[in-house]
Amino acid sequence: MSIEWYAVHTLVGQEEKAKANLEKRIKAFGLQDKIFQVLIPTEEVVELREGGKKEVVRKKLFPGYLFIQMDLGDEEEPNEAWEVVRGTPGITGFVGAGMRPVPLSPDEVRHILEVSGLLGKKEAPKAQVAFREGDQVRVVSGPFADFTGTVTEINPERGKVKVMVTIFGRETPVELDFSQVVKA
């Protein structure tokens, strides 16, 4: 058994979808003993918003790639895990020459995990949420200020909330920062 990290190509912007598809296939095929981790490495960066406001956001380090820790099997005969990864919707193939993927070096893996904050760093605290799905909220800032709507989705990791507001007589989903809404 040789457990290594491998990089696979995905469609840019479809990394999360490819990861979700792969995780479903791992469970469906019972390969938790062959495929151990699937990562989309990200790093925290500060972006400057309107009005000079700074916001910390997570950006993908390697758009178009997933990193998978797995046991690929023998040189001559890759195992079922190899086929499951290659056949996953959204994954276009392993990084490597010919038929055999090339594993990442320990230094590459350590660097990716360190920059992502997964090795030797604490996870950033998550934002506190003052409302739940289905709650009525009022928008207090931005282009939709003074609109009211219903919370349909909450993303604490990104500090975002999706609210259905009525614009020109139509229900429209709007993604807002937590700081832009208050409970009605």
UniProtKB/Swiss-Prot annotation:
HAMAP family documented for this protein: NusG
One Pfam family named in its UniProt record: NusG
CDD domains, per the entry: KOW_NusG, NGN_Bact_1
UniProt family annotation: Belongs to the NusG family.
Span of domain KOW: 133-163
PROSITE patterns, sorted: NUSG
Name used for this protein in its record: Transcription termination/antitermination protein NusG
SUPFAM superfamilies per UniProt: N-utilization substance G protein NusG, N-terminal domain, Translation proteins SH3-like domain
GO BP field: DNA-templated transcription termination; regulation of DNA-templated transcription elongation; transcription antitermination; transcription elongation-coupled chromatin remodeling
The keyword Transcription belongs to this UniProt entry's keyword annotation: yes
GO cellular component: cytosol
Transcription regulation is among the record's keywords: yes
Record keywords: Transcription, Transcription antitermination, Transcription regulation, Transcription termination
InterPro entries, A to Z: KOW, NGN, NGN-like_dom, NGN_dom_sf, NusG-like, Rib_uL2_dom2, Transcrpt_antiterm_NusG, Transcrpt_antiterm_NusG_bac_CS
Function according to Swiss-Prot or TrEMBL: Participates in transcription elongation, termination and antitermination.
